[in-house]
Design a protein with these regions (language model features):
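Hydrophobic alpha-helical topogenic segments used for membrane insertion/localization
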Residues: 307-333
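Conserved glycine-rich Rossmann-like NAD(P)H-binding loop of the short-chain dehydrogenase/reductase
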Residues: 31-48
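The beta1-alpha1 cofactor-binding region of Rossmann-like NAD(H)/NADP(H)-dependent oxidoreductases
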Residues: 42-43, 63-74, 106
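Substrate-binding pocket helix/loop in short-chain dehydrogenase/reductase
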Residues: 100-101, 108-110, 316
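Conserved glycine-rich cofactor-binding loop
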Residues: 10, 17-19
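SDR active-site lid
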Residues: 176-269
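Active-site helix of classical SDR
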Residues: 124, 159
């Protein structure tokens, strides 16, 4: 399956005004993609679209809630009317709730599923309708919690499990029908976005994402890569792969670790803000890629480098291994040579000294005939090197 170069693509991005979606929109625009941007806040969309167009890019927007299938369908039609086609559809919009499952009202639980799951289902179905003849890519944003659930974000974990199941099933059906559509599930680890700030909170403290955090640029880079190269799934960050493997291969151990750290890992240390604004029902107008809290952020990932550039990474690792082997071998050779030279010098000095002592009568002639044994005894008695 051949996908267009990003500079020739028309890309639809949901959740385009915050976090991963915003970073992806800006990066894709810089790469030359034409964009149809979707989010709920029209003011933020207008500002972002103006920013991209004034910088030499090409973007239009459609304000809608992805849980509204009819409005989302209109977004797809707008992309066709503006650009003539769609090449990649990125289902990124999502939200979360912090709180124990039994403490969260059912209406809020349902709202997360409407956005995170039904938004992906609607978007994917619309995308298949547009892509089934000319081909293209559907990229759904899952999470490491698609494989490894996290307490206090139970409904978010459940929604991302649903996204994974839906995406995998849709991929199988599309491939069985022979449709030229690549379907990718992106599974990021903790990313430094306003995610905790925009989540509704039922905890007594302000939540945080457990570290280490990765830069949203890594997710955007992966999305753009998958828009050009068919990829089944893509973990973002080494920790995502680790958590997924642990949860699947040692589930009881994973559960125990989560039980022991249920509060500490997600507690920012700050008391909960009363009447804080969250994005569950109403969005804000900020264009914010990264979280407000000062956190250590990993700007790169060796795992991702290897995933995107496997041959280059293999070559670099092989080259590094050869270089290390050469350095170690050279040092061992120098050490061996140096030891031989020192032994020869010691033996020579010992023979000269013993000969001198023998002539002066200090030691016997028999002792003088064995300088090497005398020197060896000195080494093993602790008086040598």
């Amino acid at each position: 399956m051949k996908l267009r170069n990003i500079s020739e693509q028309v890309m639809v991005i949901t959740g385009a005004t915050s976090g991963i979606g915003l970073t992806t929109a800006r990066m894709a625009a810089d790469e030359g993609a034409q964009l149809l941007l979707i989010a709920r806040n029209e003011e933020a969309l207008r500002r972002l679209t103006d920013e991209i167009n004034q910088s030499g890019g090409r973007a239009v927007y459609h304000a809608c809630d992805v849980a509204d299938e009819g409005s989302l369908r209109q977004a797809g039609e707008k992309a066709i009317s503006e650009f003539g086609r769609i090449d990649t559809w990125v289902n990124n919009a999502g939200g979360s709730i912090y709180g124990r499952i039994m403490d969260v009202p059912v209406d809020d639980l349902r709202r997360v599923f409407e956005t995170n799951v039904w938004g992906v289902i609607y978007g994917s179905r619309i995308a298949v309708e547009h892509l089934r003849d000319r081909g293209g890519a559907i990229i759904n944003i899952g999470s490491e919690v698609s494989d490894a659930p996290v307490p206090l974000q139970g409904i978010y974990s459940a929604s991302k499990h649903a996204v994974k199941g839906f995406t995998d099933a849709l991929r199988i059906e599309v491939e069985a029908d022979g449709l030229p559509i690549s379907i990718t599930l992106i599974k990021p680890t903790a990313i430094h976005t306003p995610f905790p700030e925009n989540a509704k909170n039922y905890l007594p403290y302000e939540p945080q994402l457990p570290g280490p955090l990765y830069a949203p640029d890594l997710v955007a880079e992966a999305i753009i890569h998958c828009a050009q190269h068919p990829v089944r799934d893509f973990f973002i960050g080494e920790m995502a792969k680790l958590h997924s493997s642990l949860a699947m291969n040692a589930p009881r151990l994973y559960d125990t670790v989560q039980e022991k750290t249920i509060d500490s890992m997600q507690n920012s240390g700050e008391p909960s803000v009363i009447n804080r604004h969250d994005g569950l029902y109403s969005p804000n107008s900020r264009l914010q890629e990264r979280g407000s809290a000062e956190r250590f952020v990993l700007e790169d990932s060796l795992y991702q480098r290897a995933k995107i550039h496997p041959l280059i990474t293999a070559g670099l690792l092989a080259g590094s291994g050869i270089a290390i082997a050469a350095i170690v071998g050279s040092r061992m050779k120098r050490t061996s040579s140096g030891t031989d030279n020192r032994d020869e010098m010691r033996t020579g000095r010992a023979a000269e000294l013993n000969d001198r002592h023998a002539r002066s009568g200090e030691i016997s002639a028999a002792e003088a005939a064995e300088p090497t044994r005398a020197m060896s005894a000195t080494n093993f008695d602790g008086g040598g090197i």
